[in-house]
């Protein structure tokens, strides 16, 4: 006779983790199929699944798509007066990474941590270190909230722009025709600041995306530039069986229709053998021209799209949700109203940490899933280069051994210089496995600004949302404990603290023996007058009162009952 899970939970000795200390690893999906969790999320509570299109449903191939964007932007700059020599540059995917900051004063690309501390500094193709860095950043620190000076290149669309900025700075710094200055460069009596150069690049990028031929060239060769995944129709059809599915993209309808038609262009439907369905049938609501992040605030006027011409119909749409109708503009409130959903009912899936994830989380309370295509490469290095991580751990052990028997009375000063040099060398080798700017998420032991934003705003993240295919819709994505150093480096073994050695040991806030505590309180209050407050002492909770990030709101459950 089999034992139920509820019976097994009564006895800790029968728990799987106690039967096998490595049990948890056995239940995990393959790394490349995993969805990673920052905040617990119960999938069965999700009533609506929302999608961005660019770099989410439609993943653009790298480096082909970035190369196209780079070439078109360079051509635009040359057409407005920049040197012809720039046409010789070609996009190099090994240099840029997302999350870099461009300093418009000094023309530097910076990699920083969550607090603005410098991790990497590059002026053009030249990596700056030590005293040279401190001349411009005395504390190796920047004020991230100075958005007039510092621009964060956070999106996948920013990658060509990031590399182009490095190319321009390097060219104007080293070309003999120009005189390099601290905040720009001179050509005779003409001065160009890095701020002006940056603005020219921004304007050129916007022109390429909105007025140029980027979309036209993409559509002309979809097979070259867009990833097509046969599992997409299957996942969306399964989502539609358990909830509602909507698309909210900044792209216009004509471009959206061509991209989505290609993504769903299979001879079959969701499964082999089923009949083909148009892409629109996989969504309950389709919304284009969203203008995110404005979409998550006041939004714009909601209008209806004429799908035959791609033009907008006159007037504001005020009716109920109609299947087969494509809408333009609107806001996140509009989506909630049309779908009859509230914030936490919605899981929004996108790639833009600011436009998709941060704003939907902060302004609407939507649950968030961040798509990070670079995660596949990050995981590859993490697993394939494990020897480097193991060597760093070994070097830490060497350091600990040198200091093992020393305390504040010791005059001995171990020579750790060789170990420090080796740590730096191994850390550098590890960083270079990711690319010239290192990992998207860290530099050595320190997490990047991008990593901190992922942890702060994305409830879930993965290399692709297709990974949801490998989980049931009843799944509880449970967040792992985020350990502080005193937790991650101290074993779970009982240690008797000597109160004579450590006066802090008396700061015990737990009531170990409630009967003894009650007796002491009784002794303390015997002589107090009968006129006293209703409650002299708090009582230790006998039921769960703390929020443990399990995504199990008891009030909601009671309402449903």
Curated annotation (Swiss-Prot):
Residues reported to bind adenosine 1: 154, 453
Compositionally biased tracts (Acidic residues): 550-561
> Could you tell me which species this protein originates from?
Homo sapiens (Human)
The protein depicted here goes by the name: Cytosolic purine 5'-nucleotidase
Q: Which residues form the active site?
A: 52 (nucleophile), 54 (proton donor)
Regulation of its activity: Allosterically activated by various compounds including ATP, 2,3-BPG/2,3-Bisphosphoglyceric acid and Ap4A/P1,P4-bis(5'-adenosyl) tetraphosphate. Binding of an allosteric activator is a prerequisiste to magnesium and substrate binding. Inhibited by inorganic phosphate.
Q: Where is this region: Disordered?
A: 538-561
EC code(s) of this entry? 3.1.3.5, 3.1.3.99, 2.7.1.77
Q: Which gene encodes it?
A: NT5C2
């Amino acid at each position: 006779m089999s034992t139920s899970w509820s019976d097994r939970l009564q006895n800790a000795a029968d728990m799987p983790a106690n039967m096998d200390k490595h049990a948890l690893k056995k239940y995990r999906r393959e790394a490349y199929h995993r969805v990673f969790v920052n905040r617990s999320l119960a999938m069965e509570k999700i009533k609506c699944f929302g999608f961005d299109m660019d770099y989410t449903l439609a993943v653009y191939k790298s480096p082909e798509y970035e190369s196209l964007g780079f070439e078109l932007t360079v051509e635009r700059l040359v057409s407005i007066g920049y040197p012809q020599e720039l046409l010789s540059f070609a996009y190099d995917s090994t240099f840029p990474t997302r999350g870099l900051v461009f300093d418009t004063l000094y023309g530097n690309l910076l990699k920083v941590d969550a607090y603005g501390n410098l991790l990497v500094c590059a002026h053009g193709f030249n990596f700056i270190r030590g005293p040279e860095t401190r001349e411009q950043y005395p504390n190796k620190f920047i004020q991230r909230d100075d958005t007039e000076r510092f621009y964060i290149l956070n999106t996948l669309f920013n990658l060509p722009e990031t590399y182009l900025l490095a190319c321009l700075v390097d060219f104007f710094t080293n070309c003999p025709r120009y005189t390099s200055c601290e905040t720009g460069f001179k050509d005779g009596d003409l001065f160009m600041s890095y701020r002006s150069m940056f603005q020219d690049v921004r304007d050129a990028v916007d022109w390429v995306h909105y007025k140029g031929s980027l979309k036209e060239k993409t559509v002309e060769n979809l097979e070259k530039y867009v990833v097509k995944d046969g599992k997409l129709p299957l996942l969306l059809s399964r989502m539609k069986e358990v909830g509602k599915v909507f698309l909210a993209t900044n792209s216009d309808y004509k471009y959206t229709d061509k991209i989505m038609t290609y993504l769903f262009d299979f001879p079959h439907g969701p499964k082999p053998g089923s009949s083909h369905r148009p892409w629109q049938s996989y969504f309950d609501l389709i919304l284009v021209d969203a203008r995110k992040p404005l979409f998550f605030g006041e939004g714009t006027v909601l209008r209806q799209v004429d799908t035959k011409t791609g033009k907008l119909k006159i007037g504001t749409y005020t009716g109920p949700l109609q299947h087969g109708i494509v809408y333009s503009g609107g806001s996140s409130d509009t989506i909630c109203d049309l779908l009859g959903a509230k914030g936490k009912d919605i899981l929004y899936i996108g790639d833009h940490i600011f436009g998709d994830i941060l704003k939907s989380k902060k302004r609407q309370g939507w649950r968030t899933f961040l798509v990070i295509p670079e995660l596949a490469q990050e995981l590859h290095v993490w697993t394939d280069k494990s020897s480097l991580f193991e060597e760093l751990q070994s070097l830490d052990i060497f350091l600990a051994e040198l200091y093992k028997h020393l305390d504040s009375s010791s005059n001995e000063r171990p020579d750790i210089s060789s170990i420090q040099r080796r740590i730096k060398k191994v850390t550098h080798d590890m960083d270079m496995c990711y690319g010239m700017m290192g990992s998207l998420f860290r530099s050595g032991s320190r997490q990047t600004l991008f990593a901190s934003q992922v942890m702060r705003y994305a409830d879930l993240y993965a290399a692709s949302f297709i990974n949801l295919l490998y989980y049931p819709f009843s799944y509880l994505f449970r967040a792992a404990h985020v350990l502080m150093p005193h937790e991650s480096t101290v074993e779970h073994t009982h240690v008797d603290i000597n109160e004579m050695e450590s006066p802090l040991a008396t700061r015990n806030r737990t009531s170990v023996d409630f009967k003894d505590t009650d007796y002491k309180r009784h002794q303390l209050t015997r002589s107090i007058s009968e006129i006293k407050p209703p409650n002299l002492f708090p009582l230790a909770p006998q039921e769960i009162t703390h929020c443990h990030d399990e995504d199990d709101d008891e009030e909601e459950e009671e309402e449903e009952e």
